[in-house]
């Protein structure tokens, strides 16, 4: 695999501790489809594609580090891309309020982007959202509306509340769960960027699925560019993305891996372009994320851990494979969960991975 025409060199000599020395990889990527003069927002995208620094005993494994975005996740692309698209078609103008329902990475991304572009924003969050997450979003100046934990069809639910606030304040509700701009941003941006970095030399892309927008957009782009590249979505074991994909009976939605899985299919999941969906249980996702940090110096969250686990399975079965994993976010948000031994032991998960 080459990056923007530059050769990849791997030193055959092992360094300290038997690890293989690798030279830095230089990449050239296309310009962002959502250009900005803001120096902070200009850092969104063009994230590095690195060779995963651990043997897979099979195919080659690469990791796209979306953690290099300003708020540490791929949701920065979503936020900037959707806001720019809304501005371009006149649906978002000066003085408008941007509203979204999220307590995770999207909340931080929306808060940052609206802050830098001069829009007010309101984030609705479910009760029990950690003070750290609320504080992070507020640090960029967003309003927070905390909502009770009720059924999704209850008017007090945090998504219903976001929709209502947007209507009352004549604002824009981003609605990442059904907004077709979600996968479109990745079709226009992440897919082409990945293709150029890999110089088209890849056999698989493995991507965690929450809203499904990233996997769907990348899959559509690759289907048009090189149809034999397989895009593999990754679902939580106790989730219903895979059951919706394969048309099998759905079950309960119960996972502790943030940003992975959903209780049902969403409009942002373009299944017609995705080749397969594999499920990973919470324990394996967390253990793989911890291994990535301890053994490889790569700090990612549980959803990326799940994707790395799937990619390693593919690599073992396909020695000729060249697999890109989308690393959705940084692990620095999970020091009190995934990387906390006490938290892991309370749930019966092993901690001898490091």
Can you annotate each of these PLM segments?
Residues 2-354:
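PLP-dependent amino-acid enzyme catalytic core
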